[in-house]
């Protein structure tokens, strides 16, 4: 009995062993297949982060050397629109029939100062780099040596608004070239160097700017620097029209402000600069003087003398919205003037302007 029982146990053990061996053999053959399936699945599976993780979103998925590569794009929240001084004064509520994007506009006949169009033209606002036109007027009337070499120093670096400049500290240019790129390209360091190299330095130069403004009857105008970077440089459109007519009498200011581009030498090395006003390069326009300007507080600004239908006019646009809006407003004014009959402008009659609105 014992032998029979022992034989039965041994038989069961071998049977179990055979089952285990078979199971192991099956497992060994099955494992590679499962691994292959998993590997195959892995090849077709792209692990992505959350659609938006820490300000990133999936930009594209590409295949590189048989592997998927995920490229992400950083999300940048748009900055809220900056309220200009004109907006804060409520000027954006002023409407006009031409739907100008500028909060302030003035157009007058250059020959007799007849106002053809005005919109908030007596409100003093920041004028940004239009300031440089007064800088130019003071420089040319001071009769300083225009061939004198001026050096850009650390004092000319903008540490308030951190505006860019192609002129490095140590760059040397003639006074004429400094004035040229200040008017044509609105080069801030050049404008600063011009003021700093005036007899008495920057304080005396700013005082000369304000003295000239008083001489021209610019009662709403005040300057604090030669570049226009400060929001404290303010003027009304009516005052700027007076400045334009005075500056127009200076051939150097007319030429430098309306050149499309120019090559100037800095430390003996040629540098090419271009205009900030694309209209001067247009064959459809005849422009004799111009200056653009922009800082956040001022919006887009434009001062310009042009001939339209044989008539010389002064245009001033302040606090315009959009990078091209000031030149677009100039185009709207031009079409409006071209569409008017000469009699409708009351040229020389001393009557009310063709259009007037605002404060």
Each predicted region: which residue ranges?
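Alpha-helix boundary/interfacial micro-motifs
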Residues: 16, 20-21, 126-131, 137, ...
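Active-site-adjacent loops and short helices of periplasmic peptidoglycan-processing enzymes
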Residues: 48, 52, 61-238, 242-251, ...
């Amino acid at each position: 009995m014992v032998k029979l029982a022992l034989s039965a146990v041994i038989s069961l053990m071998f049977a179990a062993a055979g089952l285990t061996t078979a199971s192991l053999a099956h497992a060994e053959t099955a494992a590679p297949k499962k691994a292959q399936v998993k590997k195959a699945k892995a090849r077709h599976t792209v692990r992505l982060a959350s659609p938006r993780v820490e300000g990133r979103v999936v930009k594209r998925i590409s295949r590189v050397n048989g592997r998927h590569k995920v490229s992400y794009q950083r999300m940048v929240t748009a900055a809220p629109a900056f309220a200009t001084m004109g907006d804060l004064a409520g000027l954006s509520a002023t409407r006009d029939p031409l739907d100008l994007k500028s909060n302030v506009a003035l157009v007058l006949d250059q020959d007799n100062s007849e106002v053809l169009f005005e919109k908030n033209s007596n409100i003093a606002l920041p004028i940004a780099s239009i300031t440089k036109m007064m800088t130019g007027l003071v420089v040319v009337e001071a009769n300083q040596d225009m061939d004198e070499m001026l050096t850009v120093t650390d004092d000319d670096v903008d540490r308030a608004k951190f505006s860019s400049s192609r002129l490095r500290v140590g760059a040397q240019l003639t006074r004429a070239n400094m004035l040229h790129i200040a008017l044509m390209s609105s080069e801030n360091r050049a404008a600063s160097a011009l003021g700093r190299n005036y007899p008495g330095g920057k304080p005396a130069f700013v005082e000369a700017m304000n003295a000239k403004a008083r001489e021209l009857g610019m009662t709403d105008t005040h300057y604090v620097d030669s570049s226009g970077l400060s929001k404290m440089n303010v003027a009304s459109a009516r005052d700027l029209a007076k400045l334009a007519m005075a500056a127009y009498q200076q051939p150097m200011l007319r030429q430098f402000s309306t050149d499309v581009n120019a090559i100037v030498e800095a430390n003996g090395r040629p540098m090419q600069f271009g205009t900030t006003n694309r209209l001067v390069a247009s064959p459809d326009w005849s422009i004799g003087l111009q200056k653009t300007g922009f800082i956040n507080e001022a919006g887009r600004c434009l001062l310009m003398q042009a001939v339209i239908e044989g008539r010389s006019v002064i245009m001033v646009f302040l606090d315009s919205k959009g990078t091209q809006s000031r030149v677009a407003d100039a185009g709207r004014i031009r079409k409006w003037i071209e569409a008017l009959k000469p009699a409708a402008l009351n040229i020389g009659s001393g009557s009310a302007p063709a259009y007037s609105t605002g404060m």
